């Protein structure tokens, strides 16, 4: 019997995270989350689902094929330089997924299915005027995705952000 954990104060984001936590537990993958309160309130449910399901699908597939089997999802609000929502996903990865030109190489068996997840992520990032960077760390065999959403460019931003994580 699986008990849902409360990892987010947003019910949809909590459900998405719990789906992947359950899948990871079943496959021996360590998944850690640190999701601060009210960090994704500006995003529609459709966009939140598209963004986080695609990010976590990609991370899950890569971690499953790696020898360390790790995923980490962090979402926080920071005011270090300006008001920003920072989404970071880090996962173990068996090999560098970029070709020599910096393009992602698909590991999917069907080439027809390649790229839709990344395009969906890029669509959401662009819609909310964010920036995304992805890189592979050869030394640690980890893939990193960093997404920044800037308060100044997000419609319907709520100012009630907290620096505290939810109790797990």
Q: Model-derived features: where do they sit?
A:
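Conserved short strand/loop->alpha-helix "switch" segment adjacent to the catalytic nucleotide/phosphoryl-transfer site
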Residues: 5-9, 31-51
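Short beta-to-alpha transition helix within the HATPase_c
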Residues: 9-27
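Short beta-strand patches within cytosolic ATPase/nucleotide-binding catalytic cores
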Residues: 32, 74, 133-135
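Conserved ATP-binding N-box helix of the HATPase_c
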Residues: 45-69, 124-127
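Short beta-strand/loop element within the Bergerat-fold HATPase_c
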Residues: 70-82
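Glycine-rich/acidic phosphate-handling loop/turn and adjacent ATP-lid/helix
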Residues: 82-119, 152, 156-167
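Glycine-rich nucleotide-binding loop
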Residues: 95, 137-146
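Glycine-rich ATP-binding loops of the HATPase_c
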Residues: 126-137
């Amino acid at each position: 019997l699986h008990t849902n954990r409360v990892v987010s104060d947003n019910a949809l984001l909590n459900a998405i995270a719990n789906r992947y936590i359950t899948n990871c537990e079943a496959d021996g993958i360590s998944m850690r989350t640190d999701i601060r309160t009210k960090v994704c309130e500006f995003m529609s449910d459709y966009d939140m689902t598209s963004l986080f399901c695609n990010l976590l699908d990609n991370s899950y597939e890569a971690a499953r094929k790696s020898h360390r089997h790790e995923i980490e999802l962090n979402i926080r609000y920071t005011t270090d330089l300006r008001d920003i929502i920072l989404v970071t996903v880090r996962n173990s990865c068996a090999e560098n997924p970029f070709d020599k030109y910096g393009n992602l190489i698909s590991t999917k068996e069907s080439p027809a299915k390649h790229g839709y997840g990344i395009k969906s992520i890029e669509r959401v990032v662009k819609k909310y005027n964010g920036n995304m960077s992805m890189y592979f760390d050869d030394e640690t065999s980890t893939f990193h995705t960093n997404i920044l959403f800037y308060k100044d460019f997000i419609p319907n931003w709520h100012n009630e952000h907290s620096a505290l994580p939810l109790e797990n």
